[in-house]
Each structure stands twice: as C-alpha cells, then as structure tokens.
Amino acid sequence: MGILKGKKILITGILNEKSIAFGIAKSMYKQEAELIFVCQNKKIINKIKYLIKSINYNTIFFCDVSHDENIKELFFNIKKVWNNFDGLVHSIAYCPKKQMHEDFVESSSRKSFNICHEISSYSFLSMARECKNMLNKFSSLVTLSYLGSQKIVSNYNMMGLAKSSLEANVRYMANSLGKNNIRVNAISSGPIKTTSSYQIKNFNKIQKIHKLFSLTKNHVSSEEIGNVAAFLCSDLSIGITGSIINVDHGFNLNGINSII
C-alpha cells in the first residue's frame, strides 16, 4: 500500500513535463494519493490535462495567485469536490527575466521586488490561510526553495531574496499553524532543468558546478524531489515541521573540497 493511500493532495505549479511539480505529481500518484491540480494560466489547461492523462486525478483548476480574490475562489471551488484534504504542494515562483541577467543592484526595482516576493512567497501564506479550515489533522504544506536563499548564487539575484522570504514563511507558518496540527516544510532542491531555471543566466554552468561539488557527483532529479515531497505529506513525517530539507546530493555542505 502506498504511503499516501487515502490522502488528498493539492498540487500547484505544473507547467510542462520538465516541471518539478510534475515529478512530485508522479511520485504522489505512485504512492496512491488522490490529487487535484492548480495551474496559473488558463491557456495551458488543456496541455496539462494531456500531460497528466496517465495520472488519476479529480480535476484541475486555474488560479492567478497575484489576486487574493482568486485564491478565495479557488478554495471555494475545491470545497465542492473535497470538503477536507490533507496536503498542499506549493510550487509557484516568478521573477522578471531581467533580474536574472543583469547586475542585481542596477536592475532591481520596487516593482520587480514586490512581484517576485508576492508570487514566490506571499502566495504560500495566502493559500495556507484560505485552506487551513479545510485541512485534516496532521495535514502537510510543502513548498520548494533553493540554496540561493542562503548563499550567493550567480544571477539568482532577486529570486534569492524571495526564497529567503519563503523559508522564513515556512518557520512562522509552522509556528502559527502548529496549534491546528498542520505541518509546514520546504524542500531546498538542487538545480534541475526546468522552463523556469533556464531563465537564469548561465544555468548550465550552475548545474555542472553542482554535479562536480555534490558529495555523490550526481544531478538532482524531479523524481527525487517528488519522493521527499510524498514523504513529507505522509504520516511517516508526522514529527517534522518548520524544516528546510536539502535534496541536493550534499552540495550545501561543501566548503573547500579536495577536488580542487
């Protein structure tokens, strides 16, 4: 029996077959979760339906998380399908491309700062607030972060700030929602080739360096992220909350490596 048998999980952020959220969906489906998907663009709903046709799911919704009223409407509609559920996977982020290709200080603006934090961090808090009364005991909220939240990663720039905000969100949300027996965690993933990651200047170099200095000398896969997300949404992780879990083949541990 799968570790998510009987669990209802909401997954956001699938864009295409390269999306980390798609890897998470496949892992959770293997573990027998019941799934609903949320996408951010109405134009790609049919494309996503085709992509996930091999995955048994309830339905797919659209939500523009930059508007609180849309988030309220999303959970109003979800309640028509699920009165209660057990988990939310937040795989949503956005940063203007310019911020990942030019000098951080010179290219940063109030507008880019606000939209990057609003979509990448605040949306997690807003979704949690709207759905908390629908969540079963020991439900799990999971989001995705990256090393650039804590360390300098070339060209990650404004997204690094937003991921720092997101990780702080995880801690404070875990504290606030703990009294409701709701757990909140983040997975800090190694670099994976996705449509979004290719917006980062010199991403291929970043990925090569990651493989060279990871402890196992391997790239991270979306399946590996999916397996950890499935664990975090299962009862096997019932004692884990407020944590940032690194899934990067140990890259985050490295200082001056003997390979030099």
Curated annotation (Swiss-Prot):
Pfam name, any one: adh_short_C2
Catalytic activity, EC: 1.3.1.9
GO MF term list: enoyl-[acyl-carrier-protein] reductase (NADH) activity; identical protein binding
Keyword NAD tagged: yes
Active site: 146, 156
Binding site for NAD(+): 13, 19-20, 40, 64-65, 92, 163, 192-196
Keywords: Biotin biosynthesis, Fatty acid biosynthesis, Fatty acid metabolism, Lipid biosynthesis, Lipid metabolism, NAD, Oxidoreductase
Gene Ontology biological-process entries: biotin biosynthetic process; fatty acid elongation
Reactions this protein catalyses: a 2,3-saturated acyl-[ACP] + NAD(+) = a (2E)-enoyl-[ACP] + NADH + H(+)
Enzyme class label: oxidoreductase
Residues with site note (Involved in acyl-ACP binding): 201, 204-205
Pathway(s) served: Lipid metabolism; fatty acid biosynthesis; Cofactor biosynthesis; biotin biosynthesis
Family note: Belongs to the short-chain dehydrogenases/reductases (SDR) family. FabI subfamily.
Biological function: Catalyzes the reduction of a carbon-carbon double bond in an enoyl moiety that is covalently linked to an acyl carrier protein (ACP). Involved in the elongation cycle of fatty acid which are used in the lipid metabolism and in the biotin biosynthesis.
Subunit structure: Homotetramer.
Name assigned to this protein: Enoyl-[acyl-carrier-protein] reductase [NADH] FabI
Top-level taxonomy: Bacteria, Pseudomonadati, Pseudomonadota, Gammaproteobacteria, Enterobacterales
